[in-house]
Amino acid sequence: MAFNDLLQQVGGVGRFQQIQVTLVVLPLLLMASHNTLQNFTAAIPTHHCRPPADANLSKNGGLEVWLPRDRQGQPESCLRFTSPQWGLPFLNGTEANGTGATEPCTDGWIYDNSTFPSTIVTEWDLVCSHRALRQLAQSLYMVGVLLGAMVFGYLADRLGRRKVLILNYLQTAVSGTCAAFAPNFPIYCAFRLLSGMALAGISLNCMTLNVEWMPIHTRACVGTLIGYVYSLGQFLLAGVAYAVPHWRHLQLLVSAPFFAFFIYSWFFIESARWHSSSGRLDLTLRALQRVARINGKREEGAKLSMEVLRASLQKELTMGKGQASAMELLRCPTLRHLFLCLSMLWFATSFAYYGLVMDLQGFGVSIYLIQVIFGAVDLPAKLVGFLVINSLGRRPAQMAALLLAGICILLNGVIPQDQSIVRTSLAVLGKGCLAASFNCIFLYTGELYPTMIRQTGMGMGSTMARVGSIVSPLVSMTAELYPSMPLFIYGAVPVAASAVTVLLPETLGQPLPDTVQDLESRWAPTQKEAGIYPRKGKQTRQQQEHQKYMVPLQASAQEKNGL
């Protein structure tokens, strides 16, 4: 009997799974809000220099006489005249600049508060020479996500999924709330970094805890559900940001609910699969019997005993004798190959995704409308992705999503700027494909890595995604060399990464691997084709040690039938 059979015995997809999955994925509604929150809290309204304090604005011309014009006839945002230019025809916008001397905005700025009454940009004057600080805040948030993926992925394999989730909810609640009351920009950035760390842990452990409690045939459904909840969060952000335009109120509104998530997360049940892989058979039995009671299978739960579990989960128990580490991803040839291929997929998906979604003001239309459209396209995209994942498999779904996204972005690079409808449509389509790619890569990664290193592998994958999200804004600077250069780069990377999927095995209908031995035995044909399967007599010392204490996988009848 394998672990999947034990899950079926205690109720399969019963009341417990329905309740826990719902409660675990609910915080993802607000995780989407945090990831793109600065599109609204750091929006840049129209602005221009404030005249000197002693300026007489009651005379004919008023404010206009202090503002030079750019080539489009609009007031300069970062310059003002050193003295009023009374004789120049600024009011009709025909004079481009004038001959007066100019200076920076030494007395501050006047902002158009009609759309964005209050943002971190207007509060701390993050414009002109300080404009880069706005991007710094988002980059530091992504650095936090990067650190969180590494730290909490590792801790989840050591301490368990439940404990780390509880900590992450509390950290998000506290740091997000403190960011809303930050007295200055450096403190705001520090708390945003801490929020990013915690949200990375929530993202990783949400997927893993749910997948490890679900039977094989429902894992794709869970992955797709998580993706849809994240997409709904994008709708939620557009509505909430429109209703609450003040950045401090908005920051608080998307952070305070995590206090409630922290409270109810104490009732989560830790993954029995993680308990067994850690060698804690007593806790495995207790968790399974508790789930059986919740699912109305008390009698089936009573049939379980320590002896039954020892016979059924001998492999997980022997696994507990060897502690996997992040270095295992590089020592073992099979895991190293997985790590390198999956890292490329994670990086490419995140790199192109954030290249599109973090420049909403660049579309020239309502930022709230674009946010809704970007959220709406996820729904059909992820539905199609789900159908492909469940019918054709994870590998073709991942390849198609990245390839189509890259093609859409590349086409945008050659379409003229005045074709705004076509360009926007392609960007939306590309964003939908990248959202489907994220959905697939989360599920695919969790199914490829063995149990004892699964969360570490997920954490390293998410780490590479955060590297992509940090590098992505830097690529936008290449537009100074050639306007379409960023789009060519954003498109070429996912197209190239899509080819990597042919080097990975298919996981559709397969039980989760618990050891490296499981992975190698199922992946032998793919490894041989790729030329990475270790030849006889060439095993490393680490692999030989694994063979001493790992028993072969004995698939149950249900698993052999893909159930």
From Swiss-Prot:
Changing R293W: Increase in substrate affinity. Glycosylated. Glycosylation at Asn-113 may occur at a secondary level. Glycosylation is necessary for proper targeting of the transporter to the plasma membrane. Involved in the renal transport of a variety of drugs with well-known nephrotoxic potential, therefore may play a role in the etiology of the drug-associated nephrotoxicity. Uptakes the diagnostic agent PAH/para-aminohippurate and clinically used drugs. Mediates the pH- and chloride-dependent bidirectional transport of PAH/para-aminohippurate in exchange for 2-oxoglutarate or glutarate as counteranions. Can also mediate PAH/cGMP exchange. Changing Y230A: Loss of membrane protein expression and little uptake of cidofovir. Gene3D superfamilies: MFS general substrate transporter like domains (1.20.1250.20). The gene is SLC22A6. One of its GO terms (cellular component) is caveola. Glycans are attached at N39, N56, N92, N97, N113. SUPFAM superfamilies: MFS general substrate transporter (SSF103473). InterPro entries: MFS_dom, MFS_sugar_transport-like, MFS_trans_sf, Orgcat_transp/SVOP. This is Solute carrier family 22 member 6. It holds the Pfam family Sugar_tr. The record marks Y230 as: Important for interaction with cidofovir. GO terms for biological process: alpha-ketoglutarate transport; metanephric proximal tubule development; monoatomic anion transport; organic anion transport; prostaglandin transport; renal tubular secretion; sodium-independent organic anion transport. GO terms for molecular function: alpha-ketoglutarate transmembrane transporter activity; antiporter activity; chloride ion binding; identical protein binding; organic anion transmembrane transporter activity; prostaglandin transmembrane transporter activity; sodium-independent organic anion transmembrane transporter activity; solute:inorganic anion antiporter activity. Strongly expressed in kidney. Expressed at lower level in liver, skeletal muscle, brain and placenta. In kidney, found at the basolateral membrane of the proximal tubule. In testis, primarily localized to the basal membrane of Sertoli cells and weakly expressed in Leydig cells and vascular endothelial cells. Secondary active transporter that functions as a Na(+)-independent organic anion (OA)/dicarboxylate antiporter where the uptake of one molecule of OA into the cell is coupled with an efflux of one molecule of intracellular dicarboxylate such as 2-oxoglutarate or glutarate. Mediates the uptake of OA across the basolateral side of proximal tubule epithelial cells, thereby contributing to the renal elimination of endogenous OA from the systemic circulation into the urine.
